[in-house]
Amino acid sequence: MTQAVMLQGTASDVGKSVLAAGLCRIFYQDGLRTAPFKSQNMALNSGITPDGKEMGRAQIFQAEAAGITPDVRMNPVLLKPTSDRQAQVVLMGKVATNMDAVSYHDYKPRLREQILAVYNSLAQEYDVIVLEGAGSPAEINLRDRDIVNMGMAEMAQCPVILVADIDRGGVFAAIYGTLALLHKQERDRVKGVIINKFRGDVALLYSGIEQIESLTGVPVLGVMPWLDVDLEDEDGVALQNDKYRGNAPRDITIAIVQLPHISNFTDFNALAAQPDVRIRYIRRPEALTDVDLVILPGSKNTLSDLAWLRESGMADAVLQTHRQGVPVMGICGGYQMLGDTIVDEVESGLGTQPGLGLLNTITRFAQDKTTTQVNATMSDELPGWLAAAAGLPVRGYEIHMGETVLQEGCCTAMTLQKNGCSVADGAVTADGLAFGTYLHGLFDSDAFTRAVVNGLRARKGLAPWETTFCYAEHKARQFDLLAEAMRQHIDIDKIYTIMQQYQEPV
């Protein structure tokens, strides 16, 4: 019989996704067939399964931690915000519709049956399911139609472990308050607490732990220290908290423009892991100094973010940096923004708008979304800092709703292999100072990444870094380090006992 455990949090960004990945790794190491599951994920970081389905990046890296291929059943509902009030609803990997928050709240009960069926089908194939909640189960205004926290735990008939973040302060109030706001049957489902992101001497917590256990009747299963592991984040909260503003001195500095609707910033994890690269996320024009490459990332609302670039002064800063000879790269929405013209009657309804004009391209938005994994080959001749990447194989995935056509003065950057056909992708100028592509995950291709970083090194008169950094091995090491730390600081035997002896609350 399949066993299951669910991690819920006292708030967003308390570390549920990472700890769920750690449990997946531990169970995998212990020889159990393990799968992650999150019924509903709200994030702009998404990826594509081998069969072309879109799902949240968190469940993708949790699946990787479990040693299995990502499956869209692990995240049947994905919400991708397009504005402060609306989100694109992706069901079982395909776009269903756009909804505002009120409409979606009314719609959720219709999803319960489908979510339960998907969960049950997944559970039939694995020994353990590690479920993850969203935000907090104490959102009492949403409880009556909940499908992701206690509502999901009820459907799965599984125990819950509550995760609390001590780094933000008020951890005991967060634990007590969360449990106090739950119904009795829901509280009875919570079998343990993990205090996460602790810095300092854990002995200082002992008296507080004793008191919170006495007040709530729920044992604290462990105190996880703040870990220096390099793992993906589920959403933009990490960016808002300045997690990625690197300060370590490195030979190469790459600026990522932090768009308001930035998507798939996990594209840059492999870059950030390079031993000679420093990544800086930039929100203000005055911060765009002393950089070797500027990247415009993906966006869930291209024209809105393009307008922000102009209004904030970032567009002028990017163009000025480009005039000074610094290369500018765009990925997906960022690629579209680098062009001359964007025609959008779909995403924003704003019609024809001028781009930044660094690439002579025209982009037209379409109703249908392209979602596919692809293999590609970089063009045989590439200029400037990209020259060493010429002819290299790369792999990635597409998630976009537009088609970009190259005009005079632009060359194709790469050739994709799709459905047995060769398809041109991307654009690069003759001097190599503007380069764009639709391909997400490009920097996960180790040889390509080392080639372009060495191209940037050459521009500064630095010798190439001869050793190619293997990002897949790096991720595997991070999963193992996480699992090792969790075994050291959390009572994993107790979690096994909780799963094995769990009985549904009456």
Swiss-Prot record:
GO terms for molecular function: ABC-type vitamin B12 transporter activity; catalytic activity. It holds the Pfam family GATase_3. It comes from the Bacteria. The keyword Chloroplast does not apply. Gene3D superfamilies: 3.40.50.880, P-loop containing nucleotide triphosphate hydrolases. Residues 251-448 form the GATase cobBQ-type domain. Keywords: Cobalamin biosynthesis, Glutamine amidotransferase. GO terms for biological process: cobalamin biosynthetic process. NCBIfam families: cobQ, PRK00784.1. Belongs to the CobB/CobQ family. CobQ subfamily. HAMAP family: CobQ. This is Cobyric acid synthase. The gene is cobQ.
